[in-house]
Each structure stands twice: as C-alpha cells, then as structure tokens.
C-alpha cells in the first residue's frame, strides 16, 4: 500500500472510529521517513490521542475501583491485575509514539511550527507514562516530559504568535503537567494565565482558519484557571481534572 492509500485508509478508519487501525496506517506513513504534511501530522496525532485516551480513561476507572475494594482481597487482586494489563497496553502505545518522534518526526521537522508540535507531543506521551509510573523510573519520565515541553515552549515564544493554536495548546498541556504531575498549582496557574492574557492582547492577529481552534483552547485555559484557583483556595470539592488539548 503506498503512502496516499495509507492516508486514505486512515481517514476511513477515523470516520469508522477505528482508531487502532488509523494509528497503524499513520505509523506506516511516518516510518516511510519523509516529513509529514500538516494533514498527515494531524491524522497521526488524532489517531494516537484516541488510542491512548481510551486506555487512560480505563486506567482511571479501574484504579478507582481498586482503591474502593480495600479489604475485599479477591476483588482487589482482580482489579490490580486488570489495571496492570491496561498499564502495559498504555506503555506500549506511548513508547510506540515516542519512538516515532525520536526516530523520524522531530529530526525531520523543518519548520518551527512542526518542531513545537512534535516536542509538545513528546511531552504529552511522557506525561501519560508518568501518570502510571512509580518509584525511581517515574522521576526520569517526569524529567523527560518537562524537558520536551520546555524545549517546545522556548521555540514557541520566539517563533509563534501568542494566538497560534499550537502555542496555546502547548501552554495548556504544559500547565496541566505542572498541576497534575509536579503538583505545582502556582506555576500551573501563572503559565496558563500568561498564555491566556498574551493571546487576549493580540486577538487581532487571529487568522480566520485558526479562530475556532484558538478560542476553544483559550476557553480551556480559562476553565482550568477557574478550577485550579478554587482548588488552591481549599475548596471542599474533590480536586478536578484539568482540561487538555
């Protein structure tokens, strides 16, 4: 199957909501070694985001059940084994993506926009690994995630408009990383607020094609700020999970 056919099959799989098939097609496109077009890049991202998202969601549900079955040994053991199975799947998916990023995508990125997109993706998939990691391995994974986000952030500040959806999406996810992985609500809030304020100040630079994407991410930044501010003020409510891109 040539590259065009693989891309067409990936689009078909997306419409059928068969994201594992979609990811497999886009993995093969990536492994051909050329730089991906914007469309191909987005297809790859959507495919793996759905594939990993299903496991992240399952992992959270099963972890919660496992915590609630304390005292019921048999049930807890079954929950633990199932959680570990989901974790193994999640790790395999993340390592798949990280391999593609390191071997092909980051090295082949000729434009700052692509470089930021892929470094953000690298930060994201290390963050997903960090969510299920423990012990000594976790510290290294967290450091890898932070470095990728920071590298992307530095490029985005000099090469992209504050209203660019990729720059905004990066700020959103980097702030979620600070809040949920590093437990630094102040840093998370200041990063999200700065990104939101800088974008608001330059709303007139918003291009028509990215208007919808940019304003949606700005809304998520604002929602997270509202949620996190109430959390840090000792809200009685259970800590909310931040929206991400």
Curated annotation (Swiss-Prot):
Compartments reported by the entry: Cytoplasm
Site, Interaction with phosphoserine on interacting protein: residue positions: 56, 127
Gene: ywhaz
Assembly and interaction partners: Homodimer.
Listed GO CC annotations: cytoplasm
Subcellular location, principal: cytoplasm
InterPro entries linked to this entry: 14-3-3 (IPR000308), 14-3-3_CS (IPR023409), 14-3-3_dom_sf (IPR036815), 14-3-3_domain (IPR023410)
Residues in coiled coil: none
GO MF, one example: phosphoserine residue binding
Listed Pfam families: 14-3-3
SUPFAM superfamilies named among the record's database cross-references: 14-3-3 protein
Protein family (similarity comment): Belongs to the 14-3-3 family.
Protein function: Adapter protein implicated in the regulation of a large spectrum of both general and specialized signaling pathways. Binds to a large number of partners, usually by recognition of a phosphoserine or phosphothreonine motif. Binding generally results in the modulation of the activity of the binding partner.
Keyword list, A-Z: Cytoplasm
Protein name (Swiss-Prot/TrEMBL): 14-3-3 protein zeta
Gene Ontology biological process terms in this record: regulation of ERK1 and ERK2 cascade
Organism domain of life: Eukaryota
TM segment ranges: none
Signal sequence coordinates: none
